[in-house]
Design a protein with these regions (language model features):
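Short acidic loop-to-helix transition motifs that present clustered carboxylates
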Residues: 83, 104-109, 165-169
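Walker B catalytic acidic pair
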Residues: 123-125, 163
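Catalytic P-loop NTPase motifs of RecA-like helicase/translocase cores
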Residues: 128-129, 167
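Loop/turn-to-beta-strand initiation segments
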Residues: 74, 116-119, 153-160
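The Walker A/P-loop phosphate-binding site
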Residues: 2-97, 108-115, 242-244
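Phosphate-binding/switch region of NTP-binding enzymes
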Residues: 141, 145-244
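Flexible beta-alpha connector loops of hexameric P-loop NTPases
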Residues: 99-103, 129-141
Length: 244
């Protein structure tokens, strides 16, 4: 059963059979990553990964994809921010080898790629384009409708990388985070002077818990620590959530 199927008749909860897809999570095999999504990624889910420049969005996404590739999943990274060689150079530093990368920004082309992959990262949502000329609001609505529906129909996990302004506000409208299933944010840990410390926050999860995890961003990527806040706000979370 696909996530996108809507039921229009009222049914008693006791008579509803939960489809297997809700229990067949895609696991990377790395517990620290899987716990962020509620013990793995739900096939067909759409996710935003938001942060200011330099916080590690690309690094996190590539690491996650590499772990999933090693677990046997087909994964792809569609970049409109860096060319294939720049991205491959970053992958070399992170020891990422199995992720398929390409410079694709066209929405329909990405949708086609989702039929052939289990997880697709789009870097970034703000860089998406169409063959037909549209204003920014129409393009945003088309991207959400096309790609999020494709995720549900194909059971491909879709991850949008999102940018924040220097003031910490989301670039564009807030339609995207309201439309997806999971909102994830990476931010500097305000309680630490160390520039390498990050907080990875899941502030919305339709299929699992919300969670905050402390992580260290080093030259070789993220090391996710054990400091976890589940189901409640961390001290500095209010400011991070205000961007969404």
């Amino acid at each position: 059963m696909k996530l996108g199927i809507a039921q229009t008749e009222f049914t008693k909860v006791k008579d509803i059979v939960i489809p297997d897809i809700f229990y067949n999570r895609m696991k990377s095999g790395v517990q620290d990553f899987d716990k962020l999504f509620g013990d793995g990624l739900l096939p067909g889910a759409s996710i935003t990964l938001t942060a200011q420049a330099g916080c590690g969005k690309t690094t996190f996404a590539l690491q996650l994809l590499e772990h999933l590739d090693q677990a046997g999943y087909d994964v792809a990274y569609a970049s409109g921010e860096e060319n294939q060689y720049q991205l491959a150079f970053t992958c070399q530093r992170l020891n990422v080898k199995g992720v398929k990368i390409a410079n694709i920004t066209d929405i329909d082309t990405i949708a086609e790629a989702m039929d052939k992959n289990d997880v697709v990262v789009v870097d970034s949502f703000q860089a998406l384009t169409t063959k037909t000329k549209m204003n920014s609001r129409a393009l945003e609505a088309y991207a959400i409708s096309t790609l999020c529906n494709k995720a549900k129909d194909s059971e491909c996990v879709l991850i949008f990388i999102m940018h924040l302004t220097k003031s910490g506000q989301l670039k564009g409208s807030t339609l995207v985070p309201h439309s997806v299933d999971v909102n994830m944010m990476i931010s500097h840990d305000m309680e630490n002077d160390d520039d390498t410390t990050r907080i990875i926050s899941v502030s919305k999860n339709r299929f699992g818990q919300t969670i905050d995890v402390q992580a260290i961003l080093g030259h070789k990527g993220f090391h996710i620590g054990e400091k976890v806040t589940t189901g409640k706000k961390a001290k500095s979370k209010k400011d991070r959530k205000s961007a969404l």
